[in-house]
Regions:
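Gly/Ser/Thr-rich active-site loops/lids in small-molecule metabolic enzymes
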Residues: 126, 215, 267-286, 354-364, ...
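N-terminal small/polar loop signature for handling phosphorylated ligands or for N-terminal nucleophile
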Residues: 36, 40, 48-112, 204-262
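Short glycine-rich phosphate-binding loop at a beta-alpha junction
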Residues: 42-54, 188-190, 291-297, 432-434
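Phosphate-binding and adjacent anionic-ligand microenvironments
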Residues: 248, 285-461
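Gly/Ser/Thr-enriched, mixed-charge loops and adjacent short helices
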Residues: 13, 113-242
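Proline/glycine-rich low-complexity loops and linkers
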Residues: 80, 131-173, 178, 264-337, ...
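An N-terminal, well-structured beta->alpha segment
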Residues: 1-68, 72-73, 162-186, 395-396
């Protein structure tokens, strides 16, 4: 995408590559821009922008900076305080906000942070607006048919208000609870909140639905978000589920837009498992619209084999829940997601929602009266080997004729027993080489073959 904004917002190390000044300028632009849009529509009420944040120490700094920018431009800032990314998307949509902002770096360590921008439909902000924000940050804004070297400041009664809007977060929790069509009474559930945004939401939702809820990593201190916790460090939840004799466990990331599960035996249930389980559940009930589950190119080869066996169609998008949702919206699909646990249920949400995902997995377990291990059993995950090759030129390495010939040779050798995927990293000088095959040795052999070709062509660093 642009200079600052990637597919998941403006992200960087707090105070280094993402500063309070950046956040202030984001607020200044958005407050001014949406007020201008309103004025052009003969609406003279101030723009309304809702803000949420995760538990990082720096999130407070960025929240205050955004509020300063928004109110200086005459917009009203509504604060959800610590909450999840999907809650901001939900409230932005149902409460008719001009846009929403989430302060989070998702699964990254505490010293990183990010600014995610959400439009009035609860979807990721259109790229053209993000590029205007970048232009303003860089002092070269041109919009509404003129250059804007400086933006006007609001004054007197036109300075924006700041509104405590924790009631919005509570209504989001009520919405989640309303989606629980079965009582969870008697079900022992473990939750790993990653010391992040879900710490003050997830347990309340499960308790309200009657579960016996056990929680780990729900004591945020500003520095421990995702620290050996949550969906990227699921081994802690695996141990917890087994030791406590729980029926199921759910692990969220820092802003709770993703979820992975642990079955009653301590096995990890990935995003691919979730797509398979819910896809089959929907098909059985005649509710899998278009008979299609949307995946990304990183989903496991075994998932597609399993879908073929069940007569379920699938689509593959580029990596990123942004691309998954775009395909779903365009083609009327009900479920899609990523192996990492970003799962989108388009009937209920416009973004990945970890807590919603866990509720849907509970629904399938209770409807089918089966433990998670049995629901996941038909999906045979193929062994996978992934190697990141640091290169001098990502595009040249991937387009090289000898490299392409090596990739083609592997694909032909695997046939319908596996697959090879070679792609550029979107954020690093890296080419990723991934092979899935019936056994680990075969994966490693073919990955090594392609990696050595890349290096022998002089692209390796």
């Amino acid at each position: 995408m642009g200079k600052y904004f990637g597919t998941d917002g403006f992200r960087g190390e707090a105070g280094i590559t993402l500063t309070a000044d950046h956040a202030y300028k984001v607020g200044r632009f958005l407050g001014w821009y949406y007020n201008m849009i309103r004025e052009r529509n003969n609406d003279h009420e101030p723009a309304r922008i809702v803000i949420g944040k995760d538990t990082r120490r720096s999130s407070y700094m960025f929240e205050y900076s955004l509020v300063a920018g928004l109110t200086a431009s005459g917009a009203d800032a509504y604060l959800l305080h610590v909450t999840t990314t999907p809650s901001v998307a939900y409230i932005a949509r149902v409460d008719d906000f001009d846009c929403g902002i989430m302060i989070s770096a998702s699964h990254n360590p505490y010293y990183d942070n990010g600014i995610k921008m959400i439009d009035c439909y609860g979807e990721k902000m259109p790229e053209e607006i993000l590029l205007l924000v970048e232009d303003y940050i860089d002092g070269k804004l041109h919009v509404f048919d003129k250059d804007w070297p400086e933006l006007p400041f609001a004054h007197r009664e036109h300075i924006g208000c700041t509104v405590d809007y924790v009631s919005g977060r509570n209504r989001y929790m009520g919405y989640l609870i309303s989606l629980g069509i079965y009582s969870f009474k008697g079900v022992k559930v473990g939750l790993d909140c990653a010391n992040g945004s879900s710490w003050n939401i997830a347990k309340s939702v499960f308790d309200a639905l009657g579960a016996d809820t056990y929680v780990i990593n729900a004591q945020p201190n500003g520095l421990n978000i995702n620290n050996n916790a949550g969906s990227t460090h699921i081994e802690g939840l695996q141990k917890f589920v087994v030791e406590k004799g729980l029926d199921i466990g759910f692990a969220y990331d820092g802003d709770a837009d993703r979820c992975l599960c642990v079955d009653e035996k301590g096995n990890v249930i990935t995003g691919d498992h979730i797509l398979y389980i819910y896809g089959c559940y929907m098909k059985e009930r005649g509710k899998l619209l278009t008979n299609t589950v949307v995946t990304t190119v990183m989903s496991n080869f075994g998932l597609y084999k399993a879908f073929d066996e069940q007569g379920i169609g699938y689509a593959k998008t580029a990596v990123g829940d942004k691309y998954v949702y775009e395909y779903m919206a365009k083609n009327g699909c009900r479920i899609g997601g990523e192996q990492s646990g970003h799962i989108i249920f388009s009937k209920y949400a416009s973004t990945g929602d970890g807590i919603l995902t866990s509720l849907k997995m509970m629904e399938v377990m209770l409807a089918k009266k089966m433990p998670m291990s049995k629901l996941a059993e038909p999906l045979k995950i193929y062994p996978q080997v992934l190697e990141n090759v640091r290169v001098t030129d990502k595009k040249a390495a991937q387009d090289d004729e000898a490299v392409q010939a090596a990739v083609k040779a592997v694909a032909e050798a695997l046939g319908d027993t596996g697959r090879i995927l070679v792609r550029e990293s979107g954020t690093e000088p890296v080419v990723r080489v991934m092979v899935e095959a019936p056994d680990h040795d075969t994966c490693q052999k073919y990955v090594t073959q392609v990696v050595e070709t890349i290096k022998s062509r002089g692209y390796g660093v």
